[in-house]
Amino acid sequence: METFDFIHKKFGFGMMRLPMNGDVVDTDQVSKMVDYFIDNGFNYFDTAHGYINGLSEKAVKTCLSSRHDRSEYILTDKLTGSFFKKQEDIRPLFESQLEATGVDYFDFYLMHAQNAHEFVKFKECKAYETAFELKKEGKVKHVGISFHDRAEVLDQILTEYPEIEIVQIQFNYLDYNDLSVQSKLVYEVCEKHDKPVLVMEPVKGGNLVKLPTDAQPILDALNGDGSNASYAIRFAASFKNMRVVLSGMSTFEQMQDNVSFMKDFKPFTKEEYKAVEEVAEVFRSHKMIPCTSCHYCVEENHCPRNIRIPEMFANYNTKKTFGDWNADYYYNNVLVSGEHSKASECVKCGMCEKVCPQHLPIRELLVQVKEEFEK
């Protein structure tokens, strides 16, 4: 496939966590990152209509498509269920995405955040059929899905729609054997259906960058000076069916680090596989909340109490893992302020749980947060 062959390296720029100046994207910084990425031989970019409340697609136009020839890069966008109610809504949404990103076609167009519930809606609205029509018209080169559910659901989707060409999955060494995320089992379904794989969350929302103090020595003992991010990203990239591993880089320094070890990619060694499994065991012993900070739970008014759910979970993990004394102050004086409610003020509506890609029991977890910080 022409587009697949044009993917220069196994590393992509996920434009979900871009550097910000307040409420706006720092386009100067992003442009610098884009240029550095392309100058070092990389060419895969990923966005979605809802990322940063629509600012990600606009940043693609400002920082990428208006500054680089279309032949220099591969661009993936996604069809998200929350932005359409019926089939007739899909084409206008798609055209608005082309306009927002400043291109006249997408290399990959993914049915976004597919799970058992979303798949029903996408079928009812003939979203897959519409995407396949867009491909015939040349507005999309390849149709795929991004997926967050159990392996048997993916098997069902790929069986019903064998035309799907690529699958984006959450895959990292912490989730590899996780019973809820099922990274290993989901990957094996992709192999069964002979579908190449795109990787999201290789560092699990940053959780595999800042390790628990009792886990860090495990990676430090390895021969070499690799960063924590390097071990996480290289782990995912070492599986043979992985075409691109995405990283949601938010600083130029992160970009430099990631490029440094992915420019001349070296697969994982047996020693490294053993080390990251030991790190995963340490994480599991801390019983951390496995939130990736995607913010779906708080976007589009999904939380009527405006609780800062991802930040509270991250703060909880920080205190539990590192014993950070500052976590209590941060909870009471930063996370709970103005219009933002305490964890105890959750009204148990469950809207957050319906959109959580990790299928977390958010209402129960907020009780844990309350018990930790509202003593």
Predicted regions and their residues:
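Hydrophobic residues in well-ordered beta-strands that form the structural core
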Residues: D46-T47, D77, V199
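N-terminal binding-site loop/beta-alpha segment at the start of enzyme catalytic domains
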Residues: M1-Y73, T130, K136
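Structured C-terminal cap/extension of enzyme domains
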Residues: T27, D35-I38, F42-N43, T62, ...
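Glycine/proline-rich, positively charged
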Residues: N21-G22, D35, F84-V203, K210-P217, ...
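Short catalytic-loop micro-motif centered on adjacent basic/acidic residues
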Residues: Y44-Y51, K141-I145, Q168, V244-L246
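Structural motif corresponding to the early beta-alpha repeats
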Residues: Y51, R67-E88, H112
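Conserved residues at the C-terminal ends of beta-strands
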Residues: G14, A48, Y109-H112, S146, ...
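Short, well-ordered alpha-helical microsegments
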Residues: S56-V60, R150-D155, M255
